């Protein structure tokens, strides 16, 4: 992938030009983590960067995703914190581009922020909710809220298309569901190395679950680990997942999914690019952590029930970013992309198919027996 803009443009080029939208991407610099990541009793030497990507259509937020990137000495973790839609995206009768765009964004992050000889992991917990990022968007009748099973399938398709410099191992775990049923949700590949594994990536060399499972904000694994700490319990990694099936997030007849993509370390370091290079490559803008936090918290207090309210909330958020001292007046960080498939492309494809379907005479003339004349 050359850069984020090129990648997103390519991901939707098979869609018609009517599919037009803009996107924005903001992120913060890495700062030392202020809470325990592995060991509850001490602050680990881990660094965190926040990344927020959003899609606009008709000047209103349509979709957004937040990814938290953690750097430890042994692992880079890309934790998908939250993702949500408003229901204000006009597909014009075409397939939705959202899965392809989000896969492209995650692929960009993996390539851009990979570190030399250090493995990377994408981590995600999915649970169906009416809204995550956009308050009151659940009141919009146009918003299609995926149920628990639909959401698991949606994320499996998104993550299945994520590409790093090397192919990842892909893990999915649905607490309380047996492996055979779980794998029915996953995309299947002719190359079995590309198929999903029912399980988790955490390998224990005698350590307890609390020593090898990182802690993330607003994450059910973290809540369970904290509960175990308060109760003074130490459990193995296998016991941890066995008990997780009985946690509040995983019961009441609804399924939840835990996903992990494991990318091996490589000999290239993607973190050497400077901020200036990122701006030239149209790869988003870095802003101050305080501004990021202010914008994010304002988002969670906004109203996205109607299109007009969504436009107003979107404009306020973008103005807050533009008015910060981190943004130069000349920087155009909101990028517009469109599908490129035309009616001529469709016609040409139809002609190609009809040509393939034409019968072809493959008989040799010498093999055709001529009918003898009657005497």
From Swiss-Prot:
This protein is called what? Histone acetyltransferase Rtt109
Enzyme Commission number(s): 2.3.1.48
- The answer to whether the entry has keyword S-adenosyl-L-methionine is no
Pfam families according to UniProt: HAT_KAT11
Task: Output the Gene Ontology terms for molecular function.
Answer: histone H3K56 acetyltransferase activity
Q: Name one GO cellular component term.
A: nucleus
Subcellular localization, as worded in the UniProt entry: Nucleus
Record has Transferase as a keyword: yes
Q: Which residues form a coiled coil?
A: none
Catalyzed reactions per annotation = L-lysyl-[protein] + acetyl-CoA = N(6)-acetyl-L-lysyl-[protein] + CoA + H(+); L-lysyl-[histone] + acetyl-CoA = N(6)-acetyl-L-lysyl-[histone] + CoA + H(+)
InterPro entries assigned to the protein according to its UniProt record, in alphabetical order: HAT_RTT109-like, Histone_AcTrfase_Rtt109/CBP, Rtt109
Q: Catalytic positions?
A: 219 (proton donor/acceptor)
Biological process terms from the Gene Ontology for this record are: DNA damage response; regulation of DNA-templated transcription
Q: Principal place where this protein is found?
A: nucleus
Assembly: Forms a complex composed of two RTT109 subunits and one VPS75 homodimer. Interacts with ASF1.
Keywords of this entry? Acetylation, DNA damage, Nucleus, Transcription, Transcription regulation, Transferase
Q: Which residues carry this modification: N6-acetyllysine?
A: 221
Binding, acetyl-CoA: 125, 144-146, 154
Per the record, the similarity remark reads:
Belongs to the RTT109 family.
Report the domain of life of the source organism: Eukaryota
Gene name linked to the record: Rtt109
Q: What is the role of this chain?
A: Histone chaperone-dependent acetylase that modifies 'Lys-56' of histone H3 (H3K56ac). Histone H3 'Lys-56' acetylation may be required for S-phase-linked DNA damage tolerance. Also acetylates 'Lys-9' of histone H3 (H3K9ac). Autoacetylates.
């Amino acid at each position: 992938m050359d850069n984020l803009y090129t990648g997103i443009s390519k991901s939707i080029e098979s869609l018609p030009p009517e599919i037009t939208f803009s996107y924005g991407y903001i992120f913060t610099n890495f700062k030392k983590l202020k809470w325990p990541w592995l060991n509850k009793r001490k602050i680990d030497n881990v660094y965190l960067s926040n990344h927020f990507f959003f899609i606009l259509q008709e000047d209103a937020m349509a979709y957004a995703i937040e990814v938290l990137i953690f750097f430890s000495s042994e692992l880079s973790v890309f934790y998908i914190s939250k993702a949500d839609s408003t229901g204000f995206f006009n597909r014009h009768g075409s397939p939705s581009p959202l899965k392809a765009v989000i896969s492209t964004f995650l692929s960009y992050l993996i390539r851009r922020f990979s570190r030399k000889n250090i493995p990377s992991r994408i981590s995600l917990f999915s649970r169906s909710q009416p809204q995550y990022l956009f308050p009151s968007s659940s009141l919009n009748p146009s918003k299609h809220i995926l149920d628990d099973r639909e959401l698991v399938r949606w994320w499996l398709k998104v993550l299945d298309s994520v590409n790093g410099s090397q192919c990842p191992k892909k893990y999915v775990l649905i607490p309380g569901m047996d492996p055979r049923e779980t794998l029915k949700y996953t995309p299947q590949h002719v190359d079995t190395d590309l198929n999903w594994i029912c399980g988790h990536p955490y390998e224990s060399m005698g350590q307890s679950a609390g020593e090898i499972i990182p802690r993330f904000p607003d994450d059910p694994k973290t809540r369970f680990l904290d509960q175990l700490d308060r109760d003074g319990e130490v459990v193995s990694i296998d016991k941890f997942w066995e008990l997780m099936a009985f946690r509040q997030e995983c019961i009441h007849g609804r399924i939840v999914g835990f996903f992990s993509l494991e990318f091996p370390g490589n000999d290239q370091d993607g973190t050497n690019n400077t901020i200036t290079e990122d701006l030239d490559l149209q790869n988003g803008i870095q802003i101050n952590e305080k501004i990021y936090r202010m914008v994010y918290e304002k988002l969670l207090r906004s109203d996205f029930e109607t299109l007009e309210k969504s436009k107003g909330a979107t404009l306020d958020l973008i103005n807050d970013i533009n008015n910060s001292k981190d943004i130069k007046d000349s920087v155009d960080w909101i990028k517009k992309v469109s599908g490129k498939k035309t009616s001529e492309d469709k016609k040409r494809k139809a002609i190609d198919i009809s040509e393939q379907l034409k019968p072809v005479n493959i008989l040799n003339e010498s093999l055709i027996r001529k009918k003898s004349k009657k005497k």
